[in-house]
Amino acid sequence: MSSWLPQNVQKRLLLYVLQQVSLFSNVDLTNLDVSLGSQSQFSFNDIDLNVKEIKLPNVDVLSGKIEKLNLQLAVAGNVDISGEGLTFVLKPIDRFFEDDLSDQWASSLTKSVIDMTKSIMESDVTDSSEHSVEALEEVSKSPTALDSMRNKVLQMALGKLSLKMKRIEFQFLLSTEVTLKFTIDTITLLTVDNKRTVDMGGIEVAFSKTQLSPTNSHQNTDSDVEENENTDSEDAMTASITYSKLEATSIYLSAMESLILESSDDAVQVVLTIDKVNIQFQGVTSINDLKVRDVIIRIDEINIYLRKISPIRKHLLSILRASLDKTSSDGTRTENMRNYKRFQQEQNIKEEEVLTAILLKKVSLHLLDDLELNLIDISLKKSEGFTTSASVFDLKLLYMSNEYFFSSPSAQPLFSMQPDQTTAEKKMFLNRDITLNVDSVLLNELLKLVEEYGSAYNYIQKITRASANQKTAEVLHFKSQSINLKILMNNISLELSMDPIKSTLPHTLFDVEKISLLLIRGDKKVLIGTLSNLIISSKTNGCFHVESFDHKFGAIDINTRTKAVLESLHLFLSQAELELISSNLIAFCGSISSFTNPNTRNNGHENVTKKSVRLLHSSNVMNKRATLSNFVLQVHKAKMTITNTLENTFGDITIEAISCILSQDQNKTLCGIVKEARLQRLYMREKTDIICNVNHDRSKPQLILNMPNSGKPKLYLKGLGLFIDSKWRDLVPSSSKGDIKQERKLTFRTMEVRLYDCSLSLKPYRICTGMVISIPKSIINFSPLGITVSLRSLETLLIDDMKVLKERNTKVLENISLSTWYQKQGYSPLIKVDVLSLHFSNTDSMAVSLKVQKVDVSVCSDSLNALMQTALDLKPAETYPDTLKYQIEPEAVDIFNELCEDFFVTKENPNDKTEDDYETPPVSQGSVNFEEEHFSTERRTVVENDSKSSVFSILTTIKIHIEEVKLKLYDGYEWRHTRKEIKSAVDRIQEDFNDGLELSETKVFDSIYIPAPKDTVENIKDNINRKIHNEETNEGKMKLRPTKKYKVLIKGRDLCIEFKGGQDKIAERASSLSSINDYCILNNTFVKVSDLEIIDNLPTSTWNKFLTRSRSNDKMAQEPAMLVIECSLIRPVPHLYATELICNINIVPLTLHVDQDTLEFLTLFFQFKDNRFELLDEYPDILYIQRLEINSVRLLLDYKPKKVDYAGLKSGKTKEFMNFFILDEARIKLKHVILYGVNGFPQLETILSDIWTPDITKTQIPGILSALTPLKPLAGLSYGARALISVPTEHYQQNGRFGGSLQNGGMVFLKTTGGEVIKLAVRLTSGTQTILENTEKLLGGQGITGRNVPITLVEGDEKVDALIDESLLRSTALFNKEPDNKSNHLDVLLADGNHQKVLSLYADQPKDFNSGLQDAYESMERNLYLTFDSMKKAKKELKTAKGAQEAVSTVAKAAPFVLIRPLIGVTEALSKTLQGLNNQYDEDRIAQIEEKYKSKKQNNNQ
């Protein structure tokens, strides 16, 4: 007991001393061993530290614990401290985070326990504070000698202090589930010559996913609290024996310890390891010198595993953001301000340096599993002043132990950073030439790294930028040596060689004068491109404003913090190099997962901030939309030159883009803009524009590309013209053509292309014409299934000679269409298309579907000839010599090959059997089936066709459906060359006539006949003007330009064309016997026209429709297609190139109203032939028609001759006899024809004429004679007389009633004969009217023009030429009770130019008898009014006559008009009355008349 007492007293004395230190205030006697002497030793076991007094910035220390702590004190002053198992638990202070992590802490169990124990802790804290105040007062009253002795003891102890700790761990509670652990295996502190040396080993940072594990070490908290309250605290020594603060605060610590989280070893992820750390510093020598200075840190190797940080990345970013927010105010402190530092430098005020240097041998950054970045020999040194210098000697980039980063050998470090003492700016240098090799494997890993940490980088950049806004950013100047980036591919490598780079952070990120692009093949390097003056700039405050455009080509502003500007980009390489690079790039990109498996995740519909910017420009305020972008790249000029294209047969190609902008908005939508794009061909010093500007405003872009992160890309093109020359097809090498034919199925990616005011220019193969397709607006959609094209309108223009094309104006012609712009260049508009839809299906067999709502073609004879020849010449015909088309030489036949050696050997004859050898056949009970038409010719033909074998695999299907087609034929001539040739021919004839030479008719362009003048009065030019424009001119000039209105209109409805193309391949030669019945089908074509009409619009013709469908009596029946054509192009011998045509044509019954002038116009129109457009082939080929079948065609023909060519009669043209007779409803039938072996279409015309003409003259003469106008009434009367007998007989045979049958026959007779009598009367009255009008014309009257008298109506200052209509006097009292005011009831019919169209007397017939009477009264009154007007004018002239001779002349002129005009009125009134009477009993005749004759209403609409 006596030995125990001193030891117990020692413990309590030491315990009293330790309890005065707050950290060890929880030490208990059970955990303390004391041994005092010359080598005093103190041992502590399992000590829970009182950490509530530890104050760390932004961190709460929850608990602390030491498993073992040994303290050795020697009399000589040595102090040795060793320990093991030191553990601290920390967490961020409350509200440290401003995100969801702080809410987790707010709702945690720890917060609840702390709030619950707050009241218990307040009383204890108060008591302890009172004792500490008393103790401080006692200490303060101690003498100063004690202070001196204490300081001396501490100085001796600190001077010989040694520390060694093992297994040190800091647990940082990031959240209730994640714990970050920082462990150190060993720490050793030694003091040598007043220098402290700290060695640390086995440093490791890890994190774990944990669960709550509350401790239960203190259970009797209530009793401890009660004991604490009843304890006498007067004597502190006694209280130290019987009382421990750990017991009083057990409830508080139990709540804190409940936050210690437990985790298994499998859940721990190591993110950082440090091999060895050596720290040397000075300071901490006495109680008055506790500062640390001259610190040098040496680290052997650091390994950072970036991939393993991903689970706690969110927590680390939150800590970083919170730390920046809480320390951002430090930048405004006086000692951190730049002005204060400058003041220190000027006043030579030096601060004591704490950190001197940090030296790291190696830092290994493990970016991914196999991707590693090593930094070797890193040095950070504090220089005299305010900045730090740094250097990195070398760098290595490794992937799977393969090195990708190389630098030139040098003794200098790779990176170095030096401070600028004068400007307090930093300068960083890259002291070596470096090379970075990138292959697809490494790029895949880098893209994975960017994808994984891109969002984190953007977040860090965002929060650091927000922090930097509150203080002035430091300036860092960077300068490098040459940098080479090498992209390794399969067969080649691409190298980017950069000149020294400069940058001034944070404003200028990248600045290089030149970047060279080299192609490496083996040991050979070729320069293929250069980039000049690339500058990348950034702004920490504010944004760059870049003028750009949206997809509607409207001006916008792009606001961005990062902007790159490239002065020029120029690539120059050959086609072979381009193909090599393209193939390698395609393979390279195909091996990258980001390209083969693009990220299709939708990032949500983020709303990009859009605002309006008010700009003041030219005293006008306008709004401009603005958008935010992550970056903007501006390229002033980009150019690419491809040399030696198509084996140097095509020349060089130059692609040029000016003022390009590339940007990416916050939705990751990539937008590219090109203001001006051009593609040129250079061959033999001649430049040809392939893609060029067509009437486009240069202030707006021509190309806009939008590529969203999710969704289809969209390309917008405006004002671009594409030029294609058909001759370029010959420049393609034969090997390439074979590759094109064998090309596999095309695949398209989803994309939308919109065209605005674009055009396609086509130049044919042999002739010099030019065709332009103008596209005002179009939408093209690409998809894996095919292509869809839709547009509202399209226009085709043509020029006859590209050599006379006017030079394009550089100035933009505003407010005009693209078609008008081309017309100013010399083109003529010919075709206009409305609402077109085209679909290209990407299947095994190519399918094209085209739907068009309306096609309007307006042509003259010369422009139609040029258009057809141009369309044929766009794809040159493939012609072959006869040796390839036909088998000229017979094949050698081995006649002995088919001889049978046993031919003469006697064999058993089956016919030699006897009667017994035959069996009796069974008797069949079935009936005999007779096959009809067994011997029919048609059936034999079908069988013959079926006997042949053919293989037709469809490779191409084209379907075209046009709802409405209009072909307008204009008189006159479009091309200047045509007009010039005609004028020259006329001038030559006129000169020869004036010289008295013998003249004959001249023919120009195979269709224009110029007759020789008969006398000096006749003027050829006036005759031509009268024929073309139907007008009289005395100017002496020829008017050969196209007429204002068309002469003939060909109108079709529902035109359907279906084309099926097969394999166009020459088969291998086979034996003659095996291939005698084989043939190859190249293509099938099916054409169907539902309705077809030809409208006659010649001024000299009174008829309306030249051709139309015959009306059927069955109105309920569905009308078939008017024209159906089925054609097949075959190759009869598969191994030869000769082709033949098989055609079948079906035509419905037709009605023709043929006027001789119209027939002559159509004949000459389609006969026009210009030698400039003649297509000459090397081997001319005439289409051979193997078989042609035309079904029987029924015609209802009306023919009106105008003149007779007597010269043709004399020469033997018997067809001229037709011009002596007028035909009215002649019924003609063209019989069914099947032709074989027709050599071309010219021969076909002759053969058909030789077949149909004799058949008509032999079998259909009676029908034609009955249609002659003089015999038409007699034929009608004879039909009525025949019906008087035939009709009763037929009815009597049917019902046996004689009375009713006789009555029916009488009705038919009366109707037929009555109608014919009325028609005859109408013809007589109309003929009489015509004779009277012609007589009046000869005597000086108005004649036919008197039907519509020209007058002048004055309205204000305008004079309108008009015509008096037949409804002039509708305000008369007989039909209208309103007051008579003729001037207000004039129906104005405008003239067609300077001439009037002639209307037939049979046009505009009244529908019934009452209408006939009304029209008769109006015509009579009109003619009487004209007579009265003529008499009134004659009376005025008589008054003004100067003599009797003049008066007699006036009366002689007026007398014929006064006498004949009333007779004309009478005949016209009688004709109208009879027409109304006839039409009342024949309602279908009105529709026939409207189709046959022109009307005044139709003339107004044309």
From Swiss-Prot:
Entry's localization field: Preautophagosomal structure membrane; Endoplasmic reticulum membrane
Principal localisation: membrane
Family: Belongs to the ATG2 family.
Protein name: Autophagy-related protein 2
Catalyzed reactions per annotation: a 1,2-diacyl-sn-glycero-3-phosphocholine(in) = a 1,2-diacyl-sn-glycero-3-phosphocholine(out); a 1,2-diacyl-sn-glycero-3-phospho-L-serine(in) = a 1,2-diacyl-sn-glycero-3-phospho-L-serine(out); a 1,2-diacyl-sn-glycero-3-phosphoethanolamine(in) = a 1,2-diacyl-sn-glycero-3-phosphoethanolamine(out)
Entry keywords, A to Z: Autophagy, Endoplasmic reticulum, Lipid transport, Membrane, Protein transport, Transport
Membrane topology: Peripheral membrane protein
